[in-house]
């Protein structure tokens, strides 16, 4: 095999990139880390605050020079040290409640990271943000320009913009945690990807989503949000977040199966090797097989998940020892829950079974999948604001059972925009007895919940759902706590022939347009 030096002899002078030895160069203000990778990667860490101030990859400066890359909006000050042990370099940045690590393996163009916390940062979220040169890295992957807000005019808060007639936001770059293994920024000659293989100390479960990328004009931001207040459904977890990896390449997209087991030998606080973990295996059954099935484990310290195989069989990721709540989902709709204990070095067998149970259905609008799939504007809501001109009319809409399309029913109703939604249906004489209208929702905002009328009868106002204190539908989120409301309809209320149901948003709060109280539909079913 030819050496690097020999290969350089065959390159024209303009194409040569200088190679240096793997190691640390220490200056009065910084540590300069050379990864000794074939496509050279060298980055600089500020010794007083842990900011990355330079990322030189294949001869190009990829770091935005106005502000560094860092945890949160920067640690301000930290105790920073760097050590080399054989083929590994570790930079350790410590404050009273946080320790952040940069780890480099000799020859790899990757900055591995992990973040250990004993308290939530004062800004109320835990993230790493790489602020990158958007002249060389203008693109965002995989969702493209939906989160490019450069040159935009703010239309909601400071995070939703109008750009060339389209609504855009950094929130529209999100992906469900269970599917988000890699997100990137790129240009014609460079690509930088965040590789995510460990969510155990994050919060929100398999279907939570958060900001991934944002070209905001000054720089292109590549994020890893470990937790935040963005439609957060559970308490933040302490301990070690990661490992997570920032991978530098020229044109190729890196794979997501990165081995970081070497962290076990680097004295990383809170790191638990596979040898000290256990697994759960078993079989899920009972749910509708037209949907993907997910099994989810969680406790106060960790969370894990996996898709099942087509026959329902599953094996968990390697888990920290402990007792977990184990949940089985049809799509994103919970159909069963149990408890399981995990021990180090062993696999626990635990089956789980459940299904959606209602009654004799008179009509059903949508499916019990925990998502607004198929409803009007659901296909666009993840990537644009409800006010976007590309959205279909929100109504108020009328849905006629038996003749309307699913897209004639709104994915959400807003108190000041399209409330109520009207449902018309025909009942037989045998269907005039007592019935239940079950309204599945996925997310509520500002206390919004449904109140029902059936013909001349008005149902009760439900108690207010838990306030997540976060904008949702306008920032591309649809999943919250998934409240389900059962409305008991007295016998004789439904008549033989034509009937009319209205579902309205009720709340003690108010707001303008799409920031008025609202909720998102999962499914609406009338049964006896």
Curated annotation (Swiss-Prot):
GO terms for biological process: cell wall organization; pectin catabolic process. This is Probable rhamnogalacturonate lyase A. Its EC number is 4.2.2.23. GO terms for molecular function: carbohydrate binding; carbon-oxygen lyase activity, acting on polysaccharides; rhamnogalacturonan endolyase activity. Glycans are attached at residues 46, 148, 351. Its main location: secreted. It is found in: Secreted. Disulfide bonds join 50-93, 184-193. The gene is rglA. SUPFAM superfamilies: Galactose mutarotase-like, Galactose-binding domain-like, Starch-binding domain-like. The keyword Flavoprotein does not apply. It comes from the Eukaryota. Pfam families: CBM-like, fn3_3, RhgB_N. InterPro entries: Carb-bd-like_fold, Gal_mutarotase_sf_dom, Galactose-bd-like_sf, GH-type_carb-bd, RG-lyase_II, RG-lyase_III, Rhamnogalacturonase_B, RhgB_N. Keywords: Carbohydrate metabolism, Cell wall biogenesis/degradation, Disulfide bond, Glycoprotein, Lyase, Polysaccharide degradation, Secreted, Signal. Belongs to the polysaccharide lyase 4 family. It is an enzyme of class 4 (lyase). Pectinolytic enzymes consist of four classes of enzymes: pectin lyase, polygalacturonase, pectin methylesterase and rhamnogalacturonase. Degrades the rhamnogalacturonan I (RG-I) backbone of pectin. The keyword ATP-binding does not apply. It catalyses: Endotype eliminative cleavage of L-alpha-rhamnopyranosyl-(1->4)-alpha-D-galactopyranosyluronic acid bonds of rhamnogalacturonan I domains in ramified hairy regions of pectin leaving L-rhamnopyranose at the reducing end and 4-deoxy-4,5-unsaturated D-galactopyranosyluronic acid at the non-reducing end. GO terms for cellular component: extracellular region. Residues 1-20 form the signal peptide.
